[in-house]
Amino acid sequence: MKFVDEAVIRVEAGDGGSGCVSFRREKYIPDGGPDGGDGGDGGSVYLQADENHNTLIEYRFERFHMAERGENGRGRDCTGHSGKDLILKVPVGTRAIDDETEEVLGDLTTHGQKLLVAKGGFHGLGNTRFKSSTNRAPRQKTLGTPGEVRSLKLELLLLADVGLLGMPNAGKSTFIRAVSRATPKVADYPFTTLVPNLGVVNPRPGQSFVIADIPGLIEGAAEGAGLGIRFLKHLERCRILLHIIDIEPIDGTDPVDSARAIVGELEKYSPKLASKPRWLVFNKADLLLEDELKEKVARVVKELGWEGDVYTISAYSRDGTKELATKLLDFIQSLPPEDKDANPDAEVEFKWDNYHQANIDAINEDYDDEFDDDFDDDDYDVEVIYQR
């Protein structure tokens, strides 16, 4: 299935049903009074994380999503049915953004987590609600409020513990093949990897972590060169980054310049991402003699002014890959647990809880006590409105 990590959709919550103006009409009960019921609330639109989904491709072709409208109220104090909520299933790791205001509405990071993205309209009130000691035959009602309408930008950010950074052909895909069962395409030309790949690494029985491989970066990626930086967002949730450096580039470029270019593009994209824990991993060590390898690694580390962890591996021959995977596992386990405060059942305060109270108070306040049409004999000869 094609990997799609971005989609723009339009969601419309259901409008609230209107209240009903109706009067009780029964034999031998000439002055039955009002019995118009309230309308139903409109359905809301939710996003729900589902681990059985792994792409947003379905939302590229189905862009408009509407919840049900609430039914109008009826006579005999019958309340209209509330509209059915619409639940849209998205992959775990999806971020919802208001496309007009760029406001981040929320991240769905756990299976089953729900996010309200469009609230249904509040129901209208029937004329029974306006009955009072001075207004015993009210003909007032309120309409349901419109449901929220939003244009949403959905972004899928892969959930991984370790992210791989590097120039094209640095050996990132070969490394992920060496430490996991992932099988990304590997070839001797740039940009072999066109979409992110995930692999599960099991350094020890029963203990594992997830590693993400993204397409390679080149200098100028922030301005759109190569595949740009659109895939860097998939590293935002990683807990550590591995900067893979080709110690013996086939095109003769200096590894120092390549490493600086990657760091520069990372800082342009997000200083927060650039500040994540990062290890330097020199790949293709099998192409050099041991003394030459040590000398070259020492030169690159010195010129970069690097003071962090440094590792030397050969992803092709798998030299050093198992040891590196074990050290990654130990590092991840040493980190404090992530704060997962997502509550799928959390209630959202209703935006229009007190919407109608002002209308009721205003009508009762403006009502003229001296004009009580309840005592007019014609009051109960008016046409009664029944809503089916």
Curated annotation (Swiss-Prot):
Residues 160-333 form the OBG-type G domain. Its cofactor is Mg(2+). Residues 1-159 form the Obg domain. CDD domains: Obg (cd01898). GO terms for cellular component: cytoplasm. Its EC number is 3.6.5.-. GO terms for biological process: ribosome biogenesis. PROSITE patterns: G_OBG (PS51710), GTP1_OBG (PS00905), OBG (PS51883). It is found in: Cytoplasm. One of its GO terms (molecular function) is GTPase activity. InterPro entries: G_OBG, GTP-bd, GTP-bd_Obg/CgtA, GTP1-OBG_CS, GTP1_OBG_dom, GTP1_OBG_dom_sf, OBG_GTPase, P-loop_NTPase. Gene3D superfamilies: GTP1/OBG domain, P-loop containing nucleotide triphosphate hydrolases. GTP binds at residues 166-173, 191-195, 213-216, 283-286, 314-316. It comes from the Bacteria. Keywords: Cytoplasm, GTP-binding, Hydrolase, Magnesium, Metal-binding, Nucleotide-binding. It holds the Pfam family MMR_HSR1. Mg(2+) binds at S173, T193. Monomer. An essential GTPase which binds GTP, GDP and possibly (p)ppGpp with moderate affinity, with high nucleotide exchange rates and a fairly low GTP hydrolysis rate. Plays a role in control of the cell cycle, stress response, ribosome biogenesis and in those bacteria that undergo differentiation, in morphogenesis control. Belongs to the TRAFAC class OBG-HflX-like GTPase superfamily. OBG GTPase family. This is GTPase Obg. It comes from Shewanella sp. (strain ANA-3).
